[in-house]
Amino acid sequence: MDKYCELIRQRYSQIASGELGYIPDALGCVLRALNEVASDEALSESVREQAAYAAANLLVSDYVNE
């Protein structure tokens, strides 16, 4: 967990403790978040590109591993 930012570690702790709800469709949750970042024109192009690349890699890995 040390390689992740403080906000991610906080949310992890909250989900693990039951304070926040766990989402069983973790891949769908991640893809929705990455899609939101990738389509937000207020963000820098490099941040949007990173989100799009990460989402595309997840989609490919999901289909390749089936």
UniProtKB/Swiss-Prot annotation:
NCBIfam families tied to this protein: PRK04964.1
Protein origin, superkingdom: Bacteria
InterPro entries assigned to the protein according to its UniProt record, in alphabetical order: UPF0253
Disulfide links within the chain: none
Family of this protein: Belongs to the UPF0253 family.
Protein name: UPF0253 protein ESA_03148
